[in-house]
A protein has these predicted regions:
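Mixed-charge (Asp/Glu-Lys/Arg
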Residues: 1-38, 45-164
């Protein structure tokens, strides 16, 4: 089924990615709240491990042929320092900085979750770029799959009778 985005799709998909991740964290024993705060979208606390995560969530929809397009995570353009905003918010809420990426295609969606520390250590470009990205090429997906510090969920879409 072809993806035809509405004028409000980016806002809708953003909320959906946050809600889906919140659901899985809650199912995993975390106390979770979605926050409207510059820098992070979710605060999650795991009472058993005493972990408190401040998560920035990036949600994207990719049409057929664009599934491998990287997701922009943190920008440093024109005095905009998204990384500083994440760290400032995590300081305010006493939590560790994490990143989540939700990407949906015509037939499935993937959600990835890892600490910003793990991202920096294993996946962040060593070049001085204006934007940090989460790569979505096949070789990158294999790296994430092999990394125990990257949490991953795949959701399959099946639309039996959905057409307008």
């Amino acid at each position: 089924m072809e993806i035809i985005k509405s004028s409000r799709h980016q806002r809708i998909i953003g909320h959906f990615g946050e809600a889906l991740l919140s659901n899985w964290l809650s199912r995993s024993g975390f106390e979770v709240t979605i926050v409207d705060h510059t820098g992070i979208d979710i605060v999650a606390y795991h009472p058993v491990t005493n972990q408190r995560l401040g998560i920035t969530v990036k949600s994207r929809t990719r049409p057929k042929g664009k599934e491998a397009t990287a997701v922009n995570l943190l920008s440093y353009r024109k005095s905009k320092d998204d990384r500083k905003k994440v760290f400032d918010a995590c300081t305010a809420f006493a939590c560790d900085p994490w990143i989540a990426v939700y990407v949906e295609t015509t037939v499935f969606a993937d959600i990835y979750l890892t600490s910003l520390r793990n991202y920096d250590k294993r996946y962040r470009s060593r070049n001085n770029l204006t934007t940090d990205t989460w790569k979505m090429r096949a070789k990158d997906l294999l790296l994430y799959e092999a990394d125990p510090e990257v949490k991953h969920i795949r959701v399959e879409f099946r639309a039996d009778s959905w057409g307008w």
